[in-house]
Amino acid sequence: MCSVGASREVILCAGAIHTPRLLLLSGVGPQADLEPLGIDTVIDLPGVGRNLQDHPWIMGLCFESKHPLPAPNYNLAGGAGFWKSRPSLDRPDLMVMPGQVPLVSDEIAARFSIPPNAFVILPCLVRPSSRGYLRLRTADPNGPLEIQPNFLAEQADVEALATCVELGLDLASQPAYRDLVKRWVVPPRRMSREATVAFVRQSCTSYLHPVGTCAMRSDGEAVVDAELRVRGIEGLRIADASVMPTIPSANTNAPSIMIGEFASRLLEAG
């Protein structure tokens, strides 16, 4: 074991999964969860590990191509489209992203025969209402975590993602796709709304954008303040996606970089 001290501050940047994990193992988190594991509570912060958010998506709607598809040079997809699931929304909550490889989840691959010369349209919910959590299952630092994203816990998320699937199929039905699509693979044909909802529940997976588990808030579940300082602990800040109170309506890489830049300015200012 190696002990390292800090003369000024410790900046925790382990991400939305491992930042709360380190805090919990160190006794910073919900006392009710720590005590049964034999972990002494340093400070009772109920919000550590709560408020887990991610982008649920369908990976993906798959179509066999009439023509050979080149391998992507540097990225799966070069663009995305944003829509509203309901006209009354103030901003889009849906994203569809075409990709030039047959990128499908294990769940979909197990149910359909995926041809190699195929492409996908990926429906994604970028403003989910469902919230999850993570917590320790043991005090052993090498032990497993319990991670529960609670995808589709809110019926509104189910309906919105079903609308996004329908939107992706509408896109594949446009004239611009006629010279490209040889046949529909996933799904093989149009579905009723009921069947679309069932397809969403069977096929939903993670976009790998976890955020929010050490959120910057102003209520009882706040973990950090407006300057990224962990509540009740001197000399400890967090600078990663875990501090986001709400998931952005896009990929989380750029916002995470912005948080890092903000942290560097705070440190420079003393």
Question: How would you label these PLM feature ranges?
Answer:
Residues 1-72, 139:
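Glycine-rich loop(s) and the adjacent beta-strand/alpha-helix scaffold that form part
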Residues 65-69, 76-255, 263-270:
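FAD-dependent oxidoreductase catalytic-site/capping-region signature
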